[in-house]
């Protein structure tokens, strides 16, 4: 059996409240992930969005959203059109199917997940609840893109790379995140990572834990973290990463972690905001 224990690195945490642009770009230039534990603790979204009715009252009962599974097997073929209020209700009540028509358990990456939700463009009032773009230098990142990600219980994204420098902040629930550096991504066995589920703790019986997962046998390092409510993770461009949305019962992750915020989530819903810093020049030339 493979043993990856010595390869696993817990992503560093910065506990400063005020994150200056200079410090942020220091991490960016070093091309290393970092968690800012207090950057977003005063965001109104952390309290307002805890009540899903706040979101529904603004978005409306009949607003249709494109919920897509996260297998990245073709964005459009997996899209499910559903009322936003219905998606929230089914997520809260855990009403999405756990087994397919053949009785096989549905993989995490095939569970419904509302990602890249353009709620800030469609409903600008939500802008006042967050404040993520202040960390970006507009001379270096002259295009800031903000999207919401709302996950049903146990949903996940397969390993992928973003199209910009991403600051992802958890508003509700938790996320188990695995990251592989650009230098190591060629050694990641993507096929095995798709075929064999990744279990994030001893209570997650679906798959194999990182320590023994064959997809990482040739990787030099495996970065991991449990990103909690109010924490922000900087994901540098070109880092390959996997994200698993954690339910309210799955908060026993790491007894040695000193962060007092657990993953208690009283209605089986995980919400996060991604704020990408991009360069229009790079998008045009690249």
From Swiss-Prot:
Residues 112-274 form the JmjC domain. SUPFAM superfamilies: Clavaminate synthase-like. Transmembrane segments: none annotated. InterPro entries: Cupin_8, JmjC_dom. Pfam families: Cupin_8. SMART domains: JmjC. It comes from the Eukaryota. Disulfide bonds: none annotated. GO terms for molecular function: 2-oxoglutarate-dependent dioxygenase activity. PROSITE patterns: JMJC (PS51184). This is JmjC domain-containing protein B. It comes from Dictyostelium discoideum (Social amoeba).
